[in-house]
Structure formats: structure tokens, C-alpha cells
Amino acid sequence: MKILITGTTGYIGKRLIPFLLKAGHELVCCVRDIERAPFKGKERVSFIEIDFLKYDPAIKLPTDIDCAYYLMHSMSASGDFGKMELECAENFKKYVAPVNLKQLVYLSGIINEKELSKHLNSRKEVEESLEGGNYALTTFRAGIIVGSGSASFEIIRDLVEKLPVMITPKWLNTKTQPISIRDVLSYLSKAAGDERLYNNNYDIYGPDVLTYKQMLEIFAEVRGLKRKIITLPIMTPKLSSYWLYFVTSTSYRLASSLVESMKVEVVARPNHLSEMLQVFPVNYHDAVVNAFAVINQDGIASSWKDSMVSSHFAGKLSKYVKVPKYGVLQDNKERDIKNEEKVLDRIWALGGSTGWYYGNTLWKARGFIDRLFGGTGLRRGRTHPSKIEAGDALDFWRVISADRKSKRLLLYAEMRMPGEAWLEFKIKNNKLYQHAVFRPRGLWGRLYWYSVLPFHYFIFNGLINSLVEDVEKKVA
């Protein structure tokens, strides 16, 4: 089958593609920014650069698409996200109108008919909009998705691993029905072309109905940790959002959205989909165990932290590829090196649990200050310890370019600051070049740069020396 994928660079999309390729399908992947396209060069995978928020009649989809997956969500988008999601759905229908599309598979959230959060109500409205297309709609509604790198999993992990005693809001007693990411992908991949599922919606769920408190307790049990959890009715949604924001790696916008959704009970409607598709979901305990098995093997295929909703990043990567030369303040350093590959390995391992090789306390302090002002801080870390792709999050940086062939890494700062900042590493002819570039925004931007200049001297000097000297010692 020829299958169209939307949400290609998202958490689900990046994981679904290998499942569909293994099943022998040909894929046409829609991406907003071609620079962020995953699986480039893979057989049976092609890409179309398209922004579903804007309809462009000049963009044409292949007319021989058999099935499509609608995986676009704006969980923490600012502004009127409901309107944005409906615009995406309406534009999608316009794009596929000339296409001989037989089936659309939409991944939504479990609906509580008595009470809906804004985001789940938006998902429902999108489903109703998509029902009006020239295809058969299959909707899968999932609750909490448990997998390495998923927002819910990483937030629970942060809470359990960082806090021996938790003073928590009362919504921790809300019931939900989690499902493993592997089972979600199995349902999605097996749905393609199955006419029994045409024009139907199904809840997909694991066998356990749990409160969020029970999920935390089971998670702690898997990790071999003893945790005390105390729930208080006095924590307001705003206070709960700040609690999640400061303790976990989530952004405040996403924390607010999650808190609103977590107050609503989402328990699945029983159905026979499991028997129909021969997918038998594992329980929550095993889903957590499976997630850590992937983490321990450095096999995380995608993470919510790499999505643009984890920060305030706006626009395409190409907008930031050209580092400005005029009207900027710079810190440029270079060092002679003997072993280019070894130094490159160290550059490619920067951030996350590795840290920045020098002055990590100062880096952490800058990250803490960034969090206080509503920024991302250092808590996102990185998805993989040694692999980097354009578009990945790396602490409070966004990877703009990661080209091992040309031996260049370019990072763009997502910190809160009065200006824009780039950090570039480049190796050429046995020399390492390190460029820190800041484009100030007005007088405050210039004052900011000069106020941190003494720290920059130690940090950037120490960083380039550590990248080179540690390698040279090992070579010697």
C-alpha cells in the first residue's frame, strides 16, 4: 500500500514509520520543515514539505494514496489551539480531496462524554471535522501513552526519581487507563487497509484502570524506590502547573495543558478490537519495564523533548542556519588538534548526562535562571547520548545542523535572553573552531552580553580546552 503520514517528526510518527516499512508499505511523509525530516535516504520513503496550517493550492499530493495517518496535535500550542487544530483538519481535507484515498486513520484521545478538557474537546471536534472527508475514517482514542520519551512517561519519571516525598494535587486520584507505546503502534500499523474498521471509532487501552497516584507508585516499585505521596486538595491548577514545571522537564504551557486534562477521568469503553487485530496490550508495570529496557540500550527512537512544543522555538531550521556576521557580539576560539574523529566524538556527546566538560556548575546555574524566567533550562537533556540530528533538543539549545561529514555542529539558544545566540563547532585541517555569536536586542541585549562576559571567558575557554586536551592526553 501507498501510505501518507502526517506528524512525521512527532513522537508517534517517528516510531510508526519503521513499523509500516517492515510491513512492506511505501510511505509519503509530510513535514513542515524538510531539514527535520527523519529517515532520509531510506528506501520506500519520500517527503513533501507542507504546512497544514496554510492551504497552498500549488502543493499537490500523489493521487494514488491508499491510506493516510493523521497524527497532528498541538498539545501545548499558544493562542487558540482549538482553532489551529480545526484549520489543520480542514486544510488536510482540501489537500486529499483530489486523492484516491480509501482510509484515514486518526489517533485521538479517550473521550469522557460527561466532562471534557479543552484539548480533548478539540480532539473530538477534529474527529468530527475529519468525518466529512472523501474517505473512510478510522479513529483510535488513546489515554496515557507509556513509552520511553513520551511526555507522560518522562514527567512521571522526573517526579519519582527526584522526589522522595511528594506533596501532590488532588487530581492524582483521577482514574485513567494507560497503554504501552508498542501496543499503540501495533494497533495503528494493523489498521491500514482493514475494511472492518472503516467509519468506526475505538478506544485503545491497556488492562489496568489506575489513578495517577497508583501509576507513580508502580513506577517507583519498578525503579526499586520508596516514595511517600501526599495529596492535598488546596493545590490550584495554576499551582499544580508550576509544580510540574519546576520539578519536571516539561514546559509551563505543556504542564498547564496536562493538568487540565489530568483532572478529567478517562476510562476506555470496552470493545473487541484487541481480538480483531490480535493485539494484546501489556499492563502498566510491564510497559514501564519495557520502556526502561529501551532506555538502557540507548534505543529511544523519538522524544517529546525534541518536538517544538518543548520550547519557544519558531520557524524553520533553515532560518537559523546562516549565522549572522554583522551587528553581533562574538567569542571566537581555535585550537590545533591531532585526532579529528576523537574530538568530533566529544562534540557529538555534549550536553545531557555528559554535561559540557567544563564549568558544569555555571551551565546549571544559567539553566536554573532560565527556568525562573519561563525558559527551558537544562532539564530536557538529550534523547541519545552520542547521536544528534537537526531539530533535536540539546539542553537549552536546538540543533540546527549536525553534519559529521563536514565536521560541523551548529546550535541555536532557546534560553530566555534579550537577543539571539548561536554556538558553532567546526573542524578543518586539524583545527577546531568554536564560535559563540550573540545578536543583541537593543540596549538590554548589549548590557546582558557584557554582564556575562567574564563567565563566558571561563566557560568557552574551558570548553574548547576540555574538548582538545582530554583527547590529546589519551592519544599521548
Language-model segments: residues:
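Mid/C-terminal beta-alpha module of Rossmann-like enzyme folds, strongest
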Residues: K2, D194-L254, E265-D331
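N-terminal Rossmann NAD(P)H-binding glycine-rich loop of SDR-like oxidoreductase domains
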Residues: I3-H25
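Hydrophobic ligand-binding cavity/cleft-lining segments
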Residues: G7, A192, V282-V289, A293-G377, ...
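Oxidoreductase cofactor-interface core, primarily capturing Rossmann-like NAD(P)-dependent enzymes
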Residues: L16, A23, K114-L225, Y242, ...
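Conserved glycine-rich Rossmann-like NAD(P)H-binding loop of the short-chain dehydrogenase/reductase
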Residues: H25-R32
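NAD(P)H-binding glycine-rich loop region in Rossmannoid oxidoreductase-like domains
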Residues: E35-V99, G109-E115
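Hydrophobic-ligand binding "helix-grip"
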Residues: G381-N429, V437-R441, V468
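A conserved amphipathic terminal alpha-helix motif
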Residues: P440-G442, R446-A476
